[in-house]
Amino acid sequence: MTLRRFIPAALTALVLLGGCTIEPPLHLRKTVATKVVLQTRVSTDILWQINWQTQWDYAWQTELYGPLGYSEPKSMRMHVYTLGDDGLRKAHNTYNFNGTEGTADIFVGYHDMLFHNNNSEVLLFRSDDDLSDINAYTRIISSGLKTSMPVLTLEQKAMATKADDETEIEESVTFMPDELFTLYKPNYYISDNLDDYEYIDGKYVLRIQGELRPATFIWLIQVKFVNNYDRVIGSMGGAAITGMSYGVNMTTGLTEEMAVSVPMDVHMNKSVDPDMMGARVLSFGIPGCNPYDDASVAAAPQGRHWFVLNVNFSTGTYKNIRIDVTDQIRALPTGGVITLEVDVDDFPPEITDPPVSGGGGFNPIMNEWEEEVGSTTIIY
């Protein structure tokens, strides 16, 4: 039996398929009744291309905002695609595991196997039909972002970068996805030969080894305000990253080419540093590429990435600003820390700024919310 190795990544998984003592022997059965146990280990140090522990300065409050890094998945879903003699998929069975254990009846023969965590209320899964690859995505919640003012960082000003006043951000806004981990084992053979199994405590056990890899990536964004003098006091509307992928094919790892904006909460801990904001955002990454493949990232469709930020002033008004973060996102396709230094004198509060509103349903950064419509098959 050949096990196909995957490139090592942050989350290593060991899958053991076992069941009760099998009678009659395996070779007399058409299916193998098994128990699946998923054991995982998370190593955040190698998930991001830079070490957030040394680059991240914002005083993040885990007890209020949750963890910065990845969490180990607590429940899993297993898709088994049975292959015919022609190598094409003929059947599709799905098994959900409470926690990390469950049972499965698998036909002897070749199968494509897909594992992913299923403990999210935000992630949705769709395919063209029951035998097609599955894409993960999130719902569209707004037709787009509201108008924002372009602002250069101190680094961009030093490089004499010209602010782009003409850019129009014309893309939908989606829910921010939760953490998603996937493992794909194509053309895997379930044998009827007992020699291919271990016999442990009265059970035949099949071990499947591989790496669960993140399919959504974490960016930590910190904004440092120069010449603030208590003018910027918070962000009621939060922020959004533009130009990110709408979803991902969990089999191939390729992100969808459709670009969307992903919103996030923004925090300001004034008792620690009144001149800094911090945010954490998850996304499927750069559209139209495999984020783990440098060549694929380099060949991805060109696009702009803006960090659109709502800032509240001590005058009781607010302003939406946008900062070009294309270079940072493209340099960190699997996530990382982005630090932005901006001068408040470049976007000071003005009499014409709209007043901060606390009205129900009002969002200063995005247009009215809307529900997604479509005809694709949604898999639950």
Question: Which residue stretches match the model-derived regions?
Answer:
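Short, low-hydrophobicity acidic/polar segments
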Residues: 87-212
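Beta-strand secondary-structure signal
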Residues: 33-39, 112-114, 207-209, 218-222, ...
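Tryptophan-paired
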Residues: 70-126, 232-332
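Solvent-exposed, conformationally flexible loop/turn segments
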Residues: 201-203, 328, 332-337
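C-terminal motif of bacterial Sec signal peptides marking the signal peptidase cleavage site
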Residues: 16-19
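Acidic/polar, low-complexity intrinsically disordered N-terminal segments immediately downstream
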Residues: 21-145, 332-380
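A sequence/structural signal for flexible, mid-protein segments enriched
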Residues: 167, 171-270
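Sec-dependent signal peptide recognition
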Residues: 4-10
